[in-house]
Amino acid sequence: MPHLTVTVSTMARSSSSRDISFETDFSSARIRWDGPRATLFLDGVESSAVDTSDPTYLEFEYMQHMSVIVHSWLGTLRRFRALHVGGAACALACAWSGQYPQSRHVAVEIDGTLAARVRQYFPIPKAPQVRIRVGDGRGVLESTREGTFDVIVRDAFAAGVTPGHLRTVEFARQVRRVLSPSGVCLVNCAHGGPANARQDVAALQEVFPFVATIQDPKVGRGGRRGNVVAVACADGVVDADNIDRALRTLALPARITRPTELKRWVAGCPPLMDEQIDYPSSP
């Protein structure tokens, strides 16, 4: 979707009284500290969690799931280029930068004030390891050369939902264009209430030969709101069996929903198109 003269993170480790609140370009933000760990809230919703003593630590389950996919996909390789559509505190970019020092990350954050503040308050590696680019994720994709990135992560939300122009078939086409041939797209989809992850998955299925998800069965059935992680790529790029085995070793075990089963879950839900949201598609 994360350098004052006196380092705020150092002061904040000792007391929750060091919690920080500030206004950004689009939201009200708060950083809550618990020892070395900080959670960024935007308009009261958890957005990022960072451990300043161990940036490879990932609090959120969906980020752990994405990391399992990337680790399986990489194999023995350690160098890759990642685009994160949605920056916030850059938790995933920081974790992967720590785990894979040869990797390079661009985090796109539409909120310029937020981008400046997270650089101020969190130990985010400097460019070229992690570069924060202020702008709209769709616009950045459309201006990026074909095959530039090996991993593209979409983890962008406003008021708890992903903006429509980041959920359409046309957006998915731009993602595939910018991905390297053996690259992977990882999408954090909200599901439940006003959010329908089936629509996000349907858009990916229109564009990518292989689409799978990681989801809690209760979330998939609509019993409660939660995250659905989608992975999209060319055939043969990821090993679903390997990913499934790794997911089962997590503190909270999970499983992969494979393409055939996923098609049944999505059946009857058409994908979102640019014209439905009056978004001007690129040529």
Residue ranges with predicted function:
Residues I20-F22, S53, Y57-R177, P181, ...:
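The AdoMet/dcAdoMet-binding core of the Class I SAM-like
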Residues P2-W33, S47-P55, S72, R221-P283:
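SAM/dcSAM-binding transferase cores
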Residues V45-A49, F157-G160, C185:
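A short, flexible beta-alpha/helix-coil linker loop
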